[in-house]
């Protein structure tokens, strides 16, 4: 034993390196063990649903999964097969997995797809936007859009996951929670933006549209990968060297919020009234004047015009902060000031890369149900629509309130109902 400790003391550098390696290896193995426990617990919970008996005349639910293997730098397929696929197969659904090979394929497949009971998106913001656009471009979208949609966040940017699922620093737990939310069947209605250019078919977005200098600098962050943790600030710093001040001129016309119709009450079985009461009700409805038609006066839409000079413009839904008790439906138009300094541009821009919901001080926010954005000819630049790049052009943006039903964590849904957004 004395010789052993003497050897360690004489070779203290190797001993220190070996101890660090052993500690790291133990921590890595412990993390893998915890991930396996999370997967096992999720599979056992899904098995409970799979063991439930269904009526003889009922059919097994059909689920169609649109998997983007290229998401998360090519790791999405492995993440899905290890963390989500076993849960879906154990819960008793008939699962069909469609792997996309190129950008836009999910959009085309959905326009031709036959009916299914559940649509599942396994990917990031881009994959989700393709699926939503494919659903709402169908000729029978009025009925097809009623199919609930599940979202398994596998991409680098999965903005909607913060709304639908509880926050988690563990990637495995985040994916298993999202998959179990589909199994449990709780849904929430989400708004959709319809964005239509002059020539192309409309594009549909769940988060929103961004146009401006913060967006332009943010997409160049990966170009400075060799700077490590300084790459975000470097992208915004070099952006200020190319051109300053960076202003975007445009005009926007918009209409105000619309009143949210009351939710339909749940149907409850009632006892059929007697024949005498039914005859009286028929006579009363026959002789009554059609007051509803006379009382309903359609007020013309009031459009407001705004000329703007901004460093960035964003048109977003309220899906990131749902308020079930709200009496109005509207989208947010945020016009950020063009008077910020270079230092503030670098600081705020670096924060917006991690949290696009942040805005500079002095930002003007408007509420609208639809708007028309006109940009000067030759302005160039690009839009970001749900983190996907599109050529900047004049567009019409319309809010489709509570258009799609998305599966969400029951805990998150309960939290929305008990503490609505302010």
UniProtKB/Swiss-Prot annotation:
Its cofactor is Mg(2+). Disulfide bonds: none annotated. PROSITE patterns: DAGK. It is found in: Mitochondrion inner membrane; Mitochondrion intermembrane space. It is a peripheral membrane protein. InterPro entries: AGK_C, ATP-NAD_kinase_N, Diacylglycerol_kinase_cat_dom, Lipid_Phosphate_FormReg, NAD/diacylglycerol_kinase_sf. One of its GO terms (molecular function) is ATP binding. Pathway: Lipid metabolism; glycerolipid metabolism. GO terms for cellular component: mitochondrial inner membrane; mitochondrial intermembrane space; mitochondrial membrane; TIM22 mitochondrial import inner membrane insertion complex. The modification N6-acetyllysine is found at residue 6. Residues 249-271 are annotated as: Disordered. This is Acylglycerol kinase, mitochondrial. The gene is AGK.
């Amino acid at each position: 034993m004395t010789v052993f400790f003497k050897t360690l003391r004489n070779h203290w550098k190797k001993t220190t390196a070996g101890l660090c390696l052993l500690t790291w290896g133990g921590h890595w193995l412990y993390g893998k063990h915890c991930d396996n426990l999370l997967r096992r617990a999720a599979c056992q919970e899904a098995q409970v649903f799979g063991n439930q008996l269904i009526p003889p005349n009922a059919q097994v639910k059909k689920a169609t999964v649109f998997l983007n293997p290229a998401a998360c730098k090519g790791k999405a397929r492995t993440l899905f097969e290890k963390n989500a696929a076993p849960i879906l197969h154990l819960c008793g659904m008939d699962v069909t997995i469609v792997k996309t090979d190129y950008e836009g394929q999910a959009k085309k497949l959905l326009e031709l797809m036959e009916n299914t009971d559940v649509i599942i998106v396994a990917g990031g913001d881009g994959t989700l936007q393709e699926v939503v656009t494919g659903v709402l471009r169908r000729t029978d979208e009025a009925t097809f859009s009623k199919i609930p949609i599940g979202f398994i966040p596998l991409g680098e940017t999965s903005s909607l996951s913060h709304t639908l699922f509880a926050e988690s620093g563990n990637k495995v737990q985040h994916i298993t929670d999202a998959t179990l939310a589909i199994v449990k069947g709780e849904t929430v209605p989400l708004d959709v933006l319809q964005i239509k250019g002059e020539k192309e078919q409309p594009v549909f977005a769940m988060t929103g549209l961004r146009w401006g200098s913060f967006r332009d600098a943010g997409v160049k962050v990966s170009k400075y990968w060799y700077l490590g943790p300084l790459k975000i600030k470097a992208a915004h710093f070099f952006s200020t060297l190319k051109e300053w001040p960076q202003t975007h001129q445009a005009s926007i016309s918009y209409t105000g919020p619309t009143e949210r119709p009351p939710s339909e009450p749940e149907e409850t079985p009632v006892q059929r009234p007697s024949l005498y009461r039914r005859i009286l009700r028929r006579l009363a409805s026959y002789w009554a004047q059609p007051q509803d038609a006379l009382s309903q006066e359609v007020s013309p839409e009031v459009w407001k015009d705004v000329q703007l000079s901004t460093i960035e413009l964003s048109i977003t839904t309220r899906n990131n902060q749902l308020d079930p008790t709200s009496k109005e439906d509207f989208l947010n138009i945020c016009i950020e000031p063009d008077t910020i300094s270079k230092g503030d541009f670098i600081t705020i821009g670096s924060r917006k890369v991690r949290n696009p919901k942040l805005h500079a001080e002095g930002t003007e926010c408007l509420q609208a149900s639809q708007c028309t954005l006109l940009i000067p000819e030759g302005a160039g630049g690009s839009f970001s629509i749900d983190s996907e790049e599109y050529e900047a052009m004049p567009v019409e943006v319309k809010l489709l309130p509570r258009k799609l039903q998305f599966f969400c964590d029951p805990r998150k849904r309960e939290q929305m109902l008990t503490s609505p957004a302010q």
